[in-house]
């Protein structure tokens, strides 16, 4: 199971990512942030090269997040197994959740954020993350952590497909 959120503070322009996974070394493979450019989370049969590639397209070629994501996914194989979320320095978002992502999976864009997850108890986990981010006042880190807490609460209150 992996769930993540990329977000931006509209007041400061600060970018950030919060991610949790059952996979080892998730922090070395999945979250990518470049100050003044954007944030990218790659997960589910992840290809770590996608993060820097998308950030390079945002920065060097001045592509919008959707175009950068499409180009990066188009140049790599196995995209249907991946989940990728992107936010740029202007707060524009893009997301991809391949049909072959593991278990119940979902990806949702919100105001200044985008979240995704796989092997979930249900799609409501990601929806709750976005709602928590949007409804929590304060600094970006507080909003990212509120989103993670919302997901964790649902993990322990929602029936899991593996429980049957």
What name fits each language-model region?
Residues 1-155:
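Alpha/propeptide regions of enzymes that mature by internal proteolysis
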Residues 156-163:
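Conserved small/polar residues in nucleotide/adenosyl-binding loops
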């Amino acid at each position: 199971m992996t769930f993540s959120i990329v977000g931006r503070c509209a007041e400061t322009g600060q970018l950030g990512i919060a991610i949790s996974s059952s996979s080892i070394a998730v922090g070395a493979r999945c979250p990518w942030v470049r100050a003044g450019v954007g944030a990218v989370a790659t997960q589910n049969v992840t290809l770590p090269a996608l993060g820097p590639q998308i950030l390079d397209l945002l920065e060097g070629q001045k592509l919008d997040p959707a175009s950068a994501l499409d180009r990066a996914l188009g140049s790599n194989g196995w995209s249907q197994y991946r989940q990728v979320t992107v936010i740029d320095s202007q707060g524009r978002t893009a997301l991809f959740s391949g049909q072959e992502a593991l278990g119940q999976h979902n990806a949702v864009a919100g105001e200044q954020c985008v979240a995704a997850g796989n092997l979930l108890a249900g799609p409501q986990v990601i929806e709750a993350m976005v709602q928590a981010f949007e409804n929590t006042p304060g600094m970006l880190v507080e909003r990212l952590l509120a989103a993670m807490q919302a997901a964790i609460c649902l993990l322990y209150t929602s029936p899991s497909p593996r429980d049957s």
